[in-house]
Amino acid sequence: SYPQALKEQVADALAGVEAIMDLKFGEAGNALLLSVRSGARASMPGMMDTVLNLGLNDETVEGLAAASGDERFAFDSYRRFLQMYGDVVLGVEHHMFEDMLEDHKDRRGVHLDTELGAEDWRQLVDDYKAMIEKELGQPFPQDPYEQLWGAIDAVFGSWMNRRAKTYRSLHNIPEEWGTAVNVQAMVFGNMGTDCATGVAFTRDPANGENAYYGEYLINAQG
């Protein structure tokens, strides 16, 4: 359980982000979207859970499409959110989303995600939501605040998942350190070839060399 004051503290901090970004969490036409990530004191790349594009729902996705002028981007972001949240928070197996995506590409006669258009992503959003409801017996949560607290719970919980525990054991990271949860305004890496996602270090994490080190993927999220 969380400290009694935490919900109010999160709400106050979220209001501060809204003011900086001039966006409103959950507002259909001007929605603030969030990323929810771990913030452990030692880097554990890929070990902890992450949820991106949080705040998207059937209304805010239309607002994102209008604001960006790119319907394909908006619905691609929504299907990514459904897949990530469905897996990390709701416990729907990751491969079920991937299998559905591959089946859709086969029917369309394409091989790459980039060959799918806005209508394809719209259809996959509907398919993902239907699959989640079938698996869980309840619909995907449309309330952004319910989404947020589900993601916060999941990221805190991921400190104790199997891969994180194994990584800590291999790298002598104490379990009692725990993790923070970072809730940030969403920055999109999937808006085109001039966008990317990646990680950067001021020292090489493998050997401590005083040199910049990093990796990135173009037109992707992570």
Feature locations, PLM:
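Nucleotide/phosphate-binding sheet-loop regions of phosphoryl- and nucleotidyl-transfer enzymes
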Residues: 1-222
